Amino acid sequence: MNVNVINHPLVRHKLTLMREADCSTYKFRTLATELARLMAYEASRDFEIEKYLIDGWCGQIEGDRIKGKTLTVVPILRAGLGMLDGVLDLIPTAKISVVGLQRDEETLKPVSYFEKFVDSMDERPALIIDPMLATGGSMVATIDLLKAKGCKNIKALVLVAAPEGVKAVNDAHPDVTIYTAALDSHLNENGYIIPGLGDAGDKIFGTR
């Protein structure tokens, strides 16, 4: 499976705090931001670098910069917005694209009700953010939309993933790497990740 579980002590510690049943909205939201920041560091580890000259205090020197078009971060509405600030803290120049999905009542598959992409998607790396990767339907649909725009370099950043969701993404898009803080046990009969985080969107927005 093309999945990278970020097994860092700080990531594990903060994720456990999020799993607590009495985790407040403020605490959950803050931890989601902190985790997204830490995890984005790992997800950006293979960004391509190019050399260029700068004027330093002692004269001209050679330095490094990230090559190519700026990353676009793609939160899946609404829960993905809870991770956006953390990624932007690390990569403040990132461009933001947004995808909103809802379930078709007949096919039960996710369909887009809102999408807004930045320009030159075919030249940018994309980082999809969503707290939960459960069935994988929303993630697969979002990747479909990005590839339809010509995007070739796509990664997914999720706080918690279920094996079923990882398999769905890998089957549909084996070229996409998933970064997660935890690969949990399974989905229950209602489609919730076990042990998971509960309804991350409700907890982030205080609507539980």
From Swiss-Prot:
Disulfide bonds: none annotated. GO terms for biological process: UMP salvage; uracil salvage. GO terms for molecular function: GTP binding; magnesium ion binding; uracil phosphoribosyltransferase activity. Its cofactor is Mg(2+). Uracil binds at I193, G198, D199, A200. Belongs to the UPRTase family. This is Uracil phosphoribosyltransferase. It comes from Neisseria meningitidis serogroup A / serotype 4A (strain DSM 15465 / Z2491). The gene is upp.
